[in-house]
Amino acid sequence: MRVSVVLCTYTLDMYHHFEEAAESVLAQTHDDVELVVVVDGSDDVCERVERDYGDRRDVLVHCNEENVGLLASRNTGAEVATGDVVAFIDDDAIADERWVEALVAAYEERDVLAAGGRMTA
């Protein structure tokens, strides 16, 4: 099962947090993960993300032309995602390495339409 994880970001001030979030997604134990990065209306951030992640096959980068907010950016990420399942993570969060594996297990073991859980520090 392919899982697309949508990660939205918008400012260089938070870029180091964004990088940690992105790297935690890319380090998942599940082997079919697509990271979908949506940059919300910042050319500087878009250029940096494309430079740092644009050549990766497991990363899809989308840059909004203008700042549309988190909800619209997440919706855009879900629209461009190619996975069977779409998950969301904030740009200041770090995913446990087995997060996607547990998500996939929930979908494969039960007849569910959605799954969620708590985030811990």
Model-derived segments and spans:
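N-proximal low-complexity "stem/linker" segments adjacent to membrane-targeting elements
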Residues: 1-24
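Short beta-strand segments
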Residues: 7, 37-38, 116-118
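Acidic donor-binding segment of Leloir-type glycosyltransferases
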Residues: 22-63
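Glycine-rich, basic loop-to-helix element that forms the pyrophosphate-binding segment
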Residues: 64-81
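Short aromatic/hydrophobic "clamp" motif used to bind/position activated sugar donors
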Residues: 86
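The conserved acidic donor/metal-binding loop of glycosyltransferases
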Residues: 90-94
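Conserved donor NDP-sugar-binding/catalytic core segment of glycosyltransferases
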Residues: 98-121
